[in-house]
């Protein structure tokens, strides 16, 4: 196959790269070069070509930007100089342009272009318009962007490694690390196998890694030059995507878990050696792999899984607030809450395990806490007498919550489980739109003065229950939190604000806190501490309004508080190395986290 090569030139006066199409059909780079724009420096190696490169360039603008007043040197031109445009003018222009774009996806694409060309401008608009733009740069819009990643692709955004590179990963990352001026602080890594609730999107998962890091910077204050998005291309089982002529990933079926584990072993070892101070966040691996990798690497590397641990943390925080309100309304003890889950994937099991800490805080043993949960998957309530459990065919991660007390009776539907359990809380992680039926929701309202209902599946197109329906079917008594954002609703003359159990409220604080503490690893206690810190971050006004989570516009302050809680727990667990933070109380630690945040 004939390849069209390119060469790069860097002008020191304006740090602009121009792609020049070569007339030759042979790509020749005699030496490795470095570019540095956007999140992180990316080396150009001889392995780069237009077809399936091992390492691609990140944040490479396709045209020279207009000179601004902040430029260190004027551009040397023979013609009249360009007008000097202030950063404030650029920011106003970008905001106006975004307002004129008709769809969220077009806004997402334009913002991605701005981030590659001018990171300061991108994060300035994110700072000013975070509440409006978070759903654009991340869920729900990022789901569509990942589905259409190859169609809207306009340039490389991070580190792309495929299964064919398995034996070369240590060499690749050693060479890569040796050329970096700014080493990575945060790596967000996915294999694209379970993107949100949308399934296997292959190399399109890069959009999730980039989106998460956008939020790390905007919400957590991580320096964008220390962020590295990574996609591990192991093929895809999505035939529609794989057969698309525009698809830029490996056009083969996804490898099995054994081969994927060998690839992950190589990557985790090489990444931790090349970037010894970085935090590695696993994102959107399919359930079996997610649990296997978390168990395999948690005690060995500085890593966590956001789908399992981050989701568990944020839902535990919301449940802490909701359970207190519900118990105040009913007069029932906190330890008597009963929770039904619709969904048996990695996120559901991870959330349920984290929520067990709530009941253990009330004095229950671990076994007693586990008995407060009932999990429903596609076959119904998970019981010891169900056929797939008896035959041993049930996924291993579900075994922890098998019920042994149903006396041989099976409960195939959500409605039948609600009648059997009579729960106080209903949590959805099924990725099935509308799965919380009107009958189920109304029955929850009959059973509880303040029913706790958390439809958490992302994006909105996969959410189990809309906020408006939740209000109507419970006569406004619902304690509601969703995974994707819903707008406030007028109900009987009162403006009601929905809770959003968005991982955005915790994962920046977990990662940032682990970085600031210099953690050797990220403990289970640190994850639980992040949930407690989030629940304590509510202001008196937010509590008075019955909110379950802090408002998103306060995310920087919230992230600092979460990070402080993570640092404190790291010190108690003996995994911190930053001695300068030891001995500080939580208020002083929060102030230190605020000072350490990066701002555009």
UniProtKB/Swiss-Prot annotation:
Its cofactor is Mg(2+); Mn(2+). GO terms for biological process: malate metabolic process. Pfam families: malic (PF00390), Malic_M (PF03949). Coiled coil: none annotated. Fumarate binds at residue 93. GO terms for molecular function: malate dehydrogenase (decarboxylating) (NAD+) activity; metal ion binding; NAD binding. Residues 1-68 form a transit peptide. The keyword Oxidoreductase applies. Divalent metal cations. Prefers magnesium or manganese. The keyword Glycoprotein does not apply. NAD(+) binds at residues 194, 344, 347. The active site is at residues 138, 212. It catalyses: (S)-malate + NAD(+) = pyruvate + CO2 + NADH; oxaloacetate + H(+) = pyruvate + CO2. It comes from the Eukaryota. Its EC number is 1.1.1.38. GO terms for cellular component: cytosol; mitochondrial matrix; mitochondrion; nucleus. Keywords: Cytoplasm, Metal-binding, Mitochondrion, NAD, Nucleus, Oxidoreductase, Transit peptide. (S)-malate binds at residues 194, 458, 502. A divalent metal cation binds at residues 283-284, 307. PANTHER family: MALIC ENZYME-RELATED, NADP-DEPENDENT MALIC ENZYME. NAD-dependent mitochondrial malic enzyme that catalyzes the oxidative decarboxylation of malate to pyruvate. Belongs to the malic enzymes family. This is NAD-dependent malic enzyme, mitochondrial.
């Amino acid at each position: 196959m004939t390849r069209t090569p390119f060469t790069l030139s860097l002008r020191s006066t304006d740090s602009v790269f121009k792609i020049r199409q070569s007339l030759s059909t042979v790509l020749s780079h005699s030496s490795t070069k470095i570019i540095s724009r956007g999140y992180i420096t990316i080396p150009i190696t001889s392995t780069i070509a237009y077809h399936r490169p091992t390492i691609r360039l990140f944040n490479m603008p396709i045209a020279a930007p207009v000179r601004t007043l902040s430029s260190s040197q004027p551009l040397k031109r023979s013609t009249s100089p360009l007008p000097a445009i202030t950063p404030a003018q650029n920011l106003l222009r970008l905001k106006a342009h975004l307002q004129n774009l008709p769809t969220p996806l077009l806004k997402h694409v334009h913002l991605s272009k701005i981030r590659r060309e001018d990171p300061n401008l991108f994060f300035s608009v994110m700072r000013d318009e975070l509440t409006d733009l978070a759903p654009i740069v991340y869920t729900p819009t990022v789901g569509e962007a990942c589905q259409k990643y190859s169609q809207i692709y306009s340039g490389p955004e991070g580190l792309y490694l495929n299964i064919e590179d398995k034996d070369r990963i240590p060499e690749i990352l050693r060479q890569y690390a040796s050329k970096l001026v700014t080493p990575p602080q945060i790596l967000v890594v996915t294999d694209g196998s379970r993107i949100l609730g949308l399934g296997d999107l292959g190399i399109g998962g890069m959009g999730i890694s980039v989106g998460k890091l956008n939020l790390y910077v905007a919400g957590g204050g991580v320096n964008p030059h220390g962020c590295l998005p990574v996609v591990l291309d192991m093929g895809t089982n999505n035939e529609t995507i794989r057969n698309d002529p525009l698809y830029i990933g490996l056009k083969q079926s996804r490898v099995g878990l054994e081969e994927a584990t060998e690839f992950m072993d190589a990557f985790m070892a090489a990444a931790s050696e090349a970037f010894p101070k970085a935090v590695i966040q696993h994102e959107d691996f399919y359930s079996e792999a997610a649990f296997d990798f978390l168990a395999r690497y948690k005690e060995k590397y500085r890593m966590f899984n956001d789908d399992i641990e981050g989701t568990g943390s944020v839902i535990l925080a919301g449940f802490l607030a909701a359970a207190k309100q519900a118990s105040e309304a009913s007069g029932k003890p906190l330890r008597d809450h009963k929770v039904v889950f619709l969904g048996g994937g990695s996120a559901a099991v991870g959330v349920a395990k984290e929520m067990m800490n709530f009941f253990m805080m009330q004095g229950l043993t671990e076994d007693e806490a586990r008995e407060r949960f009932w999990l429903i998957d596609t076959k119904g309530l998970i019981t010891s007498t169900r056929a797939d459990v008896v035959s041993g065919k049930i996924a291993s991660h579900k075994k922890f919550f098998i019920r042994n007390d149903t006396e041989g009776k099976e409960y195939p539907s959500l409605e039948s489980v609600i009648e059997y359990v009579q729960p106080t809380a209903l949590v959805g992680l099924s990725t099935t739109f509308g799965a919380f039926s009107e009958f189920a929701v109304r029955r929850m309202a009959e059973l509880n003065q303040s029913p706790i209902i958390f439809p958490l599946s992302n994006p909105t197109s996969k959410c189990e229950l809309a906020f408006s329906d939740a209000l109507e079917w419970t006569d406004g008594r619902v304690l509601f939190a969703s995974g994707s954002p819903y707008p406030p609703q007028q109900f009987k003359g009162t403006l009601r604000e929905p809770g959003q159990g968005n991982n955005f409220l915790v994962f920046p604080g977990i990662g940032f806190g682990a970085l600031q503490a210099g953690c050797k690893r990220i403990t289970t206690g640190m994850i639980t501490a992040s949930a407690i810190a989030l629940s304590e971050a509510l202001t008196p006004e937010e509590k008075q309004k019955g909110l379950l989570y802090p408002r998103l516009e306060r995310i920087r302050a919230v992230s600092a508080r979460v990070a402080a809680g993570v640092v404190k727990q790291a010190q108690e667990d003996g995994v911190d190395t930053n001695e300068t933070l030891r001995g500080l109380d939580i208020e002083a630690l929060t102030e230190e986290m605020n000072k350490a945040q990066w701002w555009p």
